[in-house]
């Protein structure tokens, strides 16, 4: 794949690079510039534009293309505007320059996650409007802050607001992930993030002594139990070629805290873990297992949750789901191979599914290395433009799904 010269650059690519240059990077994203960018897109495309401030300084921008039948539920195209931090010294090019090399690769933070999707939505809608199309169902595009740090000041609040309910969303698309093969990954569910801190208290004393009932000994027992569980899940994944990472529960020890000096046995120590719990797990039984490991370690061992998502939802991927039927039919017609999976991480789709809206996570980037959050995150312009083509086919099918029994 080679690149066109600057004078020949596709206008969609130019717009993509313009958006990439907006520094919506955590922890201090320039959300105001992003909102202004989408307001201008709405003006140019003749779309409705609504700004919803879900928390001070956190604005969800909603662009709306009305359908011909307002009694039908709408299509929601969601994307987040923030991106993760960068280590500039590890990048070949400035991560906010949107540099395009001679081969057509665009280097920028957000190139894959997920500013490409935002522009692909917009450009697909632009094409369809220019061609004079109208569809029965309204299409809403939501551009949401805060996803990269949990969405607690973004989609989590937005789905609770009357402005969200007024959208009457019947189906949603959000981000997926690149796929290095010919296939396209599509996510129909997500693992649930549980952030757990285990605290152990014990006898303090001088570090030259063999003290009993120390905080470290008891914490070691819990850590060993959890890491043994981790190994068991890892082996289950490795031994079954049909399982994907999102189908098992992962855990990583992410923080150890305790101690005041080399020669003092600490009275308190703690370990923090990031669990990603598979949607088919019995959450009550799993929490009881965590508690039992703490109890088995001895007195004075407790756990607390910094985050505990308890609402896993699965969007059916068969013809019983008319949204999936429409989505997969277009992909089949375009000869796109789909690989349905459970998202191993967490996205804003979990909040959307939790309020009863079926949703798929889909980023049309095949033959592309997975570089989200990585140094030199990049996307080839041809892959980006192919994504616009795909959405240009998907949106008419989804926005023309016949009235469901609940809508008649």
Curated annotation (Swiss-Prot):
Signal peptide: none
Binding positions (Zn(2+) 2): 113, 148, 373
Keywords on record: Cytoplasm, Hydrolase, Metal-binding, Zinc
InterPro entries, A to Z: Aminoacylase-1_M20A, ArgE/DapE_CS, Bact_exopeptidase_dim_dom, N-acyl_aa_amidohydrolase, Peptidase_M20, Peptidase_M20_dimer
GO biological process: amino acid metabolic process
GO cellular component, one term: cytoplasm
Major enzyme class: hydrolase
Swiss-Prot/TrEMBL cofactor(s): Zn(2+)
EC number(s) per entry: 3.5.1.14
Main location (coarse class): cytoplasm
Residues annotated for Zn(2+) 1 binding in this entry: 80, 113, 175
PANTHER family: AMINOACYLASE-1 (PTHR45892:SF1)
Role played: Catalyzes the hydrolysis of N-acetylated amino acids to acetate and free amino acids.
Subunit structure of this chain's protein: Homodimer. Interacts with SPHK1.
Protein name: Aminoacylase-1
Provenance organism: Pongo abelii
């Amino acid at each position: 794949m080679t690149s066109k010269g600057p004078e020949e650059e596709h206008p969609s690519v130019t717009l993509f690079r313009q958006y990439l240059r907006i520094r919506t990077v955590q922890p201090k994203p320039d959300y105001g510039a992003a909102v202004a960018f989408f307001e201008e897109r709405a003006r140019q495309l003749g779309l409705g534009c609504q700004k919803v401030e879900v928390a001070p300084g956190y604005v969800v921008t909603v662009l709306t293309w009305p359908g011909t039948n307002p009694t039908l539920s709408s299509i929601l195209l969601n994307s987040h505007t923030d991106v993760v931090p960068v280590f500039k010294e590890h990048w070949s090019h400035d991560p906010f320059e949107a540099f395009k090399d001679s081969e057509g690769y665009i280097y920028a933070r957000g190139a894959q996650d997920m500013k490409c999707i935002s522009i692909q939505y917009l450009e697909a809608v632009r094409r369809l409007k220019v061609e004079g199309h109208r569809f029965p169902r309204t299409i809403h595009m939501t551009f949401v802050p805060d996803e990269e740090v949990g969405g607690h000041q973004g989609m989590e609040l937005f789905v609770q607001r009357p402005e969200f309910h007024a959208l009457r969303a019947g189906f949603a698309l959000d981000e997926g992930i690149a796929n290095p093969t010919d296939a396209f990954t599509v996510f129909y569910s997500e693992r649930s993030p549980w952030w757990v801190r285990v605290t152990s208290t014990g006898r303090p004393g001088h570090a030259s002594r063999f003290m009993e009932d120390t905080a470290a000994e008891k914490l070691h027992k819990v850590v060993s139990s959890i890491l043994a569980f981790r190994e068991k899940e890892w082996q289950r994944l490795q031994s079954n070629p049909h399982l994907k990472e999102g189908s098992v529960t992962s855990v990583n020890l992410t923080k150890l805290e305790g101690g005041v000096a080399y020669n003092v046995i600490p009275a308190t120590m703690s370990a923090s873990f990031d669990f990603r719990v598979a949607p088919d797990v019995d959450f009550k039984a799993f929490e009881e297992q965590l508690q039992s490991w703490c109890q088995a370690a001895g007195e004075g061992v407790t756990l607390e949750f910094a985050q505990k998502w308890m609402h896993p939802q699965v969007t059916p991927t068969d013809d019983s789901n008319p949204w999936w039927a429409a989505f997969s039919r277009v992909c089949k017609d375009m000869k796109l191979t789909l690989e349905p999976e459970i998202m191993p991480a967490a996205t804003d789709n979990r909040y959307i599914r939790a309020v009863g809206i079926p949703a798929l996570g889909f980023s049309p980037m095949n033959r592309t290395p997975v570089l989200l959050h990585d140094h030199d995150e990049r996307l080839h312009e041809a892959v980006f433009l192919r994504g616009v083509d795909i959405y240009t086919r998907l949106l008419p099918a989804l926005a023309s799904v016949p009235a469901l029994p609940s809508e008649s």
